[in-house]
């Protein structure tokens, strides 16, 4: 990671099918090993290109953006992370594990998890309520990532 950037832009996707949310398993912290798929935007990519690439790399799925849900941030000691979350639609592909060839933090599993079981995967009740509420306040800046229940 280049430390010269003031901001890192992280893009994540929410893909819900049959009342289940797509998650990836990777080491995040001592408390959580599951997260929404996504990653950093690379130089020369649009947000859409970056998210479509990350979803394909991490999950094997082809997606399209349905709508932007939230823009939030996390102030870290080294730099600020701008975190943009989108609602997605699957347009093709099958779930498959990535090669992890170039990943510093490998993905060990990819699966759909019932929304009712997200707490068991380290997600907050607040985040579950955001999903069940149909993403009220979608399309807005919500401040710290904790405000939508996505803090670690």
Q: Where in this protein do the model-derived segments appear?
A:
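Nudix hydrolase/Nudix homology domain
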Residues: 31-34, 103-152
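A short coil-to-beta-strand element that immediately follows conserved catalytic motifs
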Residues: 62-70
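Residue-level preference for beta-strand/loop junctions
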Residues: 5-7, 32, 80-82
């Amino acid at each position: 990671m280049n430390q010269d950037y003031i901001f890192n832009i992280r893009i994540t996707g929410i893909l819900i099918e049959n009342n289940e949310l797509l998650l990836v398993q990777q080491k995040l912290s001592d408390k959580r090993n599951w997260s929404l798929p996504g990653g950093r935007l690379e130089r020369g990519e649009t947000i859409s290109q970056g998210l479509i690439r990350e979803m394909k790399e991490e999950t094997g799925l082809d997606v399209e953006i349905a709508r932007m849900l939230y823009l939030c941030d996390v102030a870290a000691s080294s730099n600020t992370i701008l975190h943009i979350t989108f609602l997605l639609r699957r347009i093709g592909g099958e779930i498959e594990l990535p090669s992890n060839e170039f990943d510093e933090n490998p993905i060990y599993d990819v699966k759909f998890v019932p929304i009712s079981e997200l707490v068991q995967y380290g997600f907050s009740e607040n985040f579950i309520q955001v999903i069940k509420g149909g993403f009220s306040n979608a399309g807005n800046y919500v401040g710290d990532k904790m405000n939508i229940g996505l803090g670690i």
